[in-house]
Structures are given as C-alpha cells and as structure tokens.
Amino acid sequence: DGANAEATDNKPGVFERDEKKCCWNRACTRLVPCSK
C-alpha cells in the first residue's frame, strides 16, 4: 500500500517515456496506470 502514492527518484518528464517508472511515479500515475 502506498506504492503508487510515493514518487521515486524518477525525474519529471522521464516517466512520459518509461511506463515502468511511470508506475511508481505519483504524477505519472494520473496519466498512465501501473500495469504488470
């Protein structure tokens, strides 16, 4: 719990290209949900 609520070291803008990082990025999660 809280995995999607906490942002990692991902830099803003990077998550747009990397879905995996997006999965752990709060700001990105709003755009792309975390998929297995």
UniProtKB/Swiss-Prot annotation:
Belongs to the conotoxin A superfamily. Residues 1-21 form a propeptide. This is Conotoxin Bu21. The lineage of its organism: Eukaryota, Metazoa, Spiralia, Lophotrochozoa, Mollusca. The keyword ATP-binding does not apply. One of its GO terms (molecular function) is toxin activity. Expressed by the venom duct. Disulfide bonds join C22-C28, C23-C34. It comes from Conus bullatus.
